[in-house]
Amino acid sequence: MAEEEENQELYIAENEVEEVIKDNDKLMDQGVTEDEAEQEQNDTMNNMVMDMSVQGFFEHKDSVFSVSINPVHSNLCASGGGDDLGYIWDITTGEQICQLTGHKDSIVAIDWSFDGTYIATGGMDSQVRLWKSSTGFEFITAFETVDEIVWLSWHPKGLFLAAGCNDGSIWMWSLPSGKVVQVMYGHTAPVNAGKFIPPGVGKRLATVDDSGTLIVWNPATGAPECRMSSDDHRFDPGNEETAAGWTSFDCNAEGNVLFLGGSSGKVKVVNINSSHILASLEAQTESVEAIALCTALPICACASVDGTVALYDSASLKFRKSLPHEQAVIDCKFLPNTPYLLTACADCVIRKWDVRSGQLLGEYTGHQEPILCMAITPDGKRVVTGSDDTELLVFDCEH
């Protein structure tokens, strides 16, 4: 009986048949050819980004504009973004430690005090807010200015905080009292960058603005010690056709020479003790977004929107070489006391370079949108990046 059943033909009724459509037929019905489908698949594969990060933080709901690493407890990272929030989080575990609230607009600046005890946030709502880390990030106070905050800078040896505003004013407070020490006026345009100089000493405060003016202040008195403006055409960051301002700068260890980057691509080198222009460097054609001086070698790196990083000899002021990138370079920083430079690019990639040879040593990927900010741990082993994709990623930059 079993043998008969085996030999019987299998009969399937017509109403039991399901039509099987081949993938190719379906694609044709949808108006997509095999070649187009294959190309779409290849494009998808090409757009997949390898995530090389060792940790990350994903609580922000909008672009991350600023990031800072605690100088004493280097596992602590502070970040601020377009969601009006700041966060304190651990770069080793990715865990949130504290949410910093109270701003009514984007946080565009965030910075730790020199001893790591305070964290300050600056927002487009004209507020500077302050928290104390040693008391569980207890909120201390809020400082009101008259316009959007552009940058923050702590004094490298004391509890003094400076802030630059969109209206051209510069504010300085003493902590922990919160007393306003100085309000400095002299700029007539947004103050794009400012910091205490020289590095690690902070005897003076240098600021640059969107109209092409540099002012070096005495922070104790609030008086300007050096003022250079585009009224002197030799100092003008623009040209006859286009007005321009200063967008970035860095200072030498002695505190007497500044390298200034302009929105037209020009770099000026000035002695602020004598107010003399030492050089005009014009290897780039678009805005210089960041300038970094190497502490291990006489090298100055200038990152530009034109997709290059220009390297100059900071002693002879001669052009050395250009480091090419795929898109605009947003930031550049040297690993501490090394000839190794990290660059953050709008193509979502962090790159590591040896500035002695110009050799590309590594690329670190993981972001899906342009990188807007980065911070390096004090030991130079890791870099934290913030992006338009709302994420913060941690990369091991030793390898």
From Swiss-Prot:
<keyword id="KW-0853">WD repeat</keyword>
<dbReference type="Pfam" id="PF00400">
    <property type="entry name" value="WD40"/>
</dbReference>
<dbReference type="GO" id="GO:0005829">
    <property type="term" value="C:cytosol"/>
</dbReference>
<keyword id="KW-0963">Cytoplasm</keyword>
<feature type="repeat" description="WD 7">
    <location>
        <begin position="324"/>
        <end position="363"/>
    </location>
</feature>
<feature type="repeat" description="WD 2">
    <location>
        <begin position="102"/>
        <end position="141"/>
    </location>
</feature>
<feature type="repeat" description="WD 4">
    <location>
        <begin position="187"/>
        <end position="227"/>
    </location>
</feature>
<feature type="repeat" description="WD 3">
    <location>
        <begin position="144"/>
        <end position="185"/>
    </location>
</feature>
<keyword id="KW-0677">Repeat</keyword>
<dbReference type="InterPro" id="IPR015943">
    <property type="entry name" value="WD40/YVTN_repeat-like_dom_sf"/>
</dbReference>
<protein>
    <recommendedName>
        <fullName>Uncharacterized WD repeat-containing protein C25H1.08c</fullName>
    </recommendedName>
</protein>
<feature type="repeat" description="WD 6">
    <location>
        <begin position="283"/>
        <end position="322"/>
    </location>
</feature>
<dbReference type="InterPro" id="IPR001680">
    <property type="entry name" value="WD40_rpt"/>
</dbReference>
<dbReference type="GO" id="GO:0030687">
    <property type="term" value="C:preribosome, large subunit precursor"/>
</dbReference>
<dbReference type="GO" id="GO:0005634">
    <property type="term" value="C:nucleus"/>
</dbReference>
<feature type="repeat" description="WD 8">
    <location>
        <begin position="366"/>
        <end position="399"/>
    </location>
</feature>
<dbReference type="GO" id="GO:0180023">
    <property type="term" value="P:cytosolic large ribosomal subunit assembly"/>
</dbReference>
<dbReference type="InterPro" id="IPR036322">
    <property type="entry name" value="WD40_repeat_dom_sf"/>
</dbReference>
<keyword id="KW-0539">Nucleus</keyword>
<dbReference type="InterPro" id="IPR051179">
    <property type="entry name" value="WD_repeat_multifunction"/>
</dbReference>
<feature type="repeat" description="WD 5">
    <location>
        <begin position="241"/>
        <end position="280"/>
    </location>
</feature>
<feature type="repeat" description="WD 1">
    <location>
        <begin position="59"/>
        <end position="99"/>
    </location>
</feature>
